[in-house]
């Protein structure tokens, strides 16, 4: 387990919650969807909103099913990023560019995430591109932030075209540079 990635992820969770506390004097809030319950939810629904907070998964999950299906070994930072916690998506800014970190809200969301991962890897294989895994969406819907599976480097990727730029040497360093934001 890459404790550095996990440490930086949980540090970002704390910075995200602190930003909400400073700006809104509360925990983060999400629209309550009764069919989409999460262990992150806290308290009662008010005005169709529910408070929430990222929580550590105990025990952490793994992605051995994806590794077996694709016959690859996932970079440990990818596994730590997606398997360590439940959380809603986390809006942030990277060097003046808005992004949203992808996380799993509940077990069903984690299963959907894994299906999307399989499709992403298969598309890359078909296009003869290096394997990478998305970790964040960008304001340009054709771009994602992803982790190169072979090296752990974080890159800006254009879907169907490949790498645009290396953003960080590793996921922990990338997470440390992010500034949390609140999307109204």
From Swiss-Prot:
Taxonomic lineage of the native organism: Bacteria, Pseudomonadati, Pseudomonadota, Gammaproteobacteria, Alteromonadales
HAMAP family, A to Z: Syd
A Pfam family that the UniProt record links to this protein: Syd
Domain of life: Bacteria
Main function: Interacts with the SecY protein in vivo. May bind preferentially to an uncomplexed state of SecY, thus functioning either as a chelating agent for excess SecY in the cell or as a regulatory factor that negatively controls the translocase function.
Protein name: Protein Syd
Keywords, sorted A to Z: Cell inner membrane, Cell membrane, Membrane
Subcellular location: Cell inner membrane
Family: Belongs to the Syd family.
Chain coiled-coil ranges: none
Matches recorded under InterPro entries: Syd, Syd_sf
RNA-binding found in the keyword field: no
Record bears the keyword Kinase: no
Any one annotated GO CC term: cytoplasmic side of plasma membrane
CDD domains recorded: Syd
Main location (coarse class): membrane
Membrane topology listed for this record: Peripheral membrane protein
Chain's gene name: syd
């Amino acid at each position: 387990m890459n404790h550095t990635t996990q440490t930086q992820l949980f540090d970002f969770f704390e910075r995200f919650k602190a930003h909400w506390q400073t700006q809104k004097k509360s925990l983060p809030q999400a629209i309550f969807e009764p069919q989409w319950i999460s262990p992150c939810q806290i308290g009662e629904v008010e005005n169709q909103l529910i408070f929430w907070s990222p929580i550590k998964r105990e025990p952490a999950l793994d992605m051995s099913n994806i590794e077996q299906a694709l016959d690859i070994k996932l970079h440990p930072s990818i596994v730590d990023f997606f398997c360590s916690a439940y959380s809603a998506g986390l809006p942030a800014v990277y060097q003046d560019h808005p992004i949203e970190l992808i996380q799993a809200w509940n077990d069903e969301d984690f299963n959907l995430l894994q299906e999307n991962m399989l499709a992403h890897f298969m598309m890359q294989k078909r296009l003869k591109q290096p394997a990478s895994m998305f970790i964040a969406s960008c304001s340009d819907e054709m771009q994602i932030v992803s982790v190169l599976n072979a090296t752990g480097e974080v890159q800006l990727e254009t879907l169907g075209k490949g790498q645009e730029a290396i953003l960080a040497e590793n996921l922990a360093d990338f997470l440390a540079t992010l500034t949390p934001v609140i999307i109204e």
